[in-house]
């Protein structure tokens, strides 16, 4: 059974490809959460006794820090977990910015609605990830810092979003997740540990089978098959009809995880791109970068 996921709110193999998450993180890097008024409003809400019997799957959402003011109005009846995006790591495992995570009422609020809360930790880029993953002390520094953030906030777990992992760090990534899992399970009762993983493993950097066994779930980023800089317009998450599409990705994960279906989380997008194009034909050539629309 493939878990479904609600995502916040080719093609891929190109020199100017950038992660959608990285683009948003850079776009909003100067954004400051003004939580006081939002949290005070949320405290006036009465907790809802959610009935999870109607949910046939685990349903996970992401709350980006730049959309923090939306959290009191989310429909928590449709969620079982929510990840706060994000705590940004340095190459050496320090926390660059956690966006006031430990002081956010959102954590207590979501938990009062019966929803588990995880912190999403991010680091993007081959050089940065090589520096972090190849060094024991950097790995331990990151793990200790993330564990402190989760414990001090009373959250339920961690979600690791490392993107553009180089092939040279395949084994070190598994080692990092083993070390992280050990530390979290040693400190917390039944922590939830998940990872964001790519739609296509272009460089053979991901040991899906080992990572699925270590974690509670691999969140398959099933989007950005066509991206902002694509030479042709197309769907960001085509179900089928292309060589690389959702069907290909799911089958690839099933094959490489030895059918660990209880560990696969399919991430689906709530966005698309609006490109300037040559004509109105399907998959027309683009004449510039696309703008994300939700």
Where are these regions (language model features)?
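Structural recognition of alpha->loop->beta junctions
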Residues: 75-85, 135-163, 207-225
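Hydrophobic h-region of N-terminal signal peptides that target proteins for export
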Residues: 4-14
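Extracellular/periplasmic catalytic domains that process cell-envelope and extracellular macromolecules
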Residues: 52-55, 73-78, 110-113, 151-153, ...
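Substrate-binding surface in catalytic domains of secreted glycosidases
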Residues: 91-101, 144, 165-294
């Amino acid at each position: 059974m493939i878990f479904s996921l609600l995502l916040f709110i080719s093609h891929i193999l190109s020199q100017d490809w950038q992660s959608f998450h990285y683009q948003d993180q850079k776009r909003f890097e100067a954004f400051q959460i003004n939580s006081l008024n939002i949290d005070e409003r949320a405290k006036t809400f009465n907790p809802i006794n959610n009935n999870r019997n109607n949910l046939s799957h685990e349903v996970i959402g992401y709350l980006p820090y730049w959309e923090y003011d939306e959290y009191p109005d989310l429909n928590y009846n449709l969620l079982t977990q929510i990840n706060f995006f994000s705590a940004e790591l340095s190459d050496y495992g320090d926390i660059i910015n956690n966006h006031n995570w430990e002081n956010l009422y959102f954590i207590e609020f979501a938990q009062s609605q019966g929803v588990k809360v995880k912190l999403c930790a991010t680091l993007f880029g081959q050089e940065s990830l090589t520096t972090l993953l190849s060094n024991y002390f950097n790995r331990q520094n990151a793990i200790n810092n993330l564990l402190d953030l989760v414990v001090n906030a009373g959250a339920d777990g961690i979600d690791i979003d490392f993107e553009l992992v180089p092939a040279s760090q395949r084994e070190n990534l598994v080692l990092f997740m083993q070390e992280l899992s050990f530390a979290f399970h040693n400190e917390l009762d039944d922590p939830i540990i998940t990872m964001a993983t790519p739609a296509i493993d272009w460089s053979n950097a991901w040991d899906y089978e080992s990572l699925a066994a270590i974690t509670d779930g691999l969140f398959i980023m099933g989007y950005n098959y066509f991206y902002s800089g694509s030479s042709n317009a197309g769907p960001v998450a085509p179900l089928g009809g292309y060589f690389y599409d959702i069907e290909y990705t799911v089958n690839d994960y099933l094959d490489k995880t030895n059918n660990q279906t209880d560990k696969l989380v399919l991430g689906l997008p709530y966005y698309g791109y609006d490109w300037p194009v040559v004509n109105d034909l399907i998959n027309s050539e683009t004449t510039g970068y696309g703008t994300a629309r939700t």
